[in-house]
Amino acid sequence: MTFKWNVHYTGSKGNSVSIYTNQFNILVDAGKPYKFIEPLLYEKHFLIFTHRHGDHFKPAVYKKIRENFPNIKILANEEVSNLMFEKTKIPADVVFSDNFQFQIGTMKFTTIQNYHGAGEELVDCHGLIIEDIESGEVLLYATDLSTTIDYQEYLDKNSLQVDYFLLESNYDPQVIEFYESTKAHTGFDIFSNGSYRHLSSTEHKEFTEKYCKPDSIVVPLHQSETYSTFEGLIKRTKKDENRLTMEEVEEWKKSKNK
């Protein structure tokens, strides 16, 4: 196995993932307090920040990393690097854009744009693909995205299939549809107020099935505690006046199939 990884934290409460290759080691994001991030920084060559949201980048944590781990090279897109300079006066070592590439030994690293938000809320966000050009193994890392179109374009253009998917699977559209059909729903537009910025479980499944190899490994990231499963939704509403039950879910499913 060319790649190893450790998903330390994923989700709206903080994100940080280690990726190990036979040429270099990367920490992706540092979206937790420093005491949680510091143990993850040893033996890392690069730290890449995917975007500016607080569950991925914290200026105070970034400043302490710079002070205590000066040999780690920091990679960030222009929006994040500008925020780094604004808050700490220290920009990223490498400022990248879409399809930025570098190669160390047999490892080829490419940044891919993530669509995360829309209109004025659009955030400059990136994921990555790492290819071992010797073994042919491919790792894909992406979270906080609403579509995989740019990944599909890159994989198709380069005739690649993926060995290791570290990919967001945030919500199940059926769970949201069911919740919005019940009296427990408050009228809050779940999709428009956040879910549209993330990848659904159905899109996750379609994409991974299309680009997987026979023995690919798929690791779902950033799964919503409430909206990724019916069980999560039921748990979320168990203390509400109009709490939901699995019996109601089954009745709703039957009504949809009529």
Task: Report residues per predicted region.
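Short, charged/polar "capping" segments at the starts of alpha-helices
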Residues: F36, E79-E86, V175, T226-F230
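Conserved beta-strand hairpin/beta-sheet module of binuclear metal-dependent hydrolase folds
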Residues: M1-L40, D124-D144, Y164
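Catalytic core of the metallo-beta-lactamase
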Residues: F100-E168
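Extended recognition/assembly regions associated with phosphoester-bond processing machinery
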Residues: T2-H8, S16, Y62, A142, ...
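Glycine/small-residue-rich loop that forms an oxyanion/phosphate-binding "nest" at active or ligand-binding sites
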Residues: K58-P59, K64-E121
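Active-site metal-binding loops of divalent metal-dependent hydrolases
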Residues: T10, A30-K32, R52, E79, ...
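Cap/insert and terminal regions of metallo-dependent hydrolase folds
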Residues: Q152-W252
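Active-site metal-binding motif and surrounding structural segment of the metallo-beta-lactamase
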Residues: P33-E79, Q161-D163
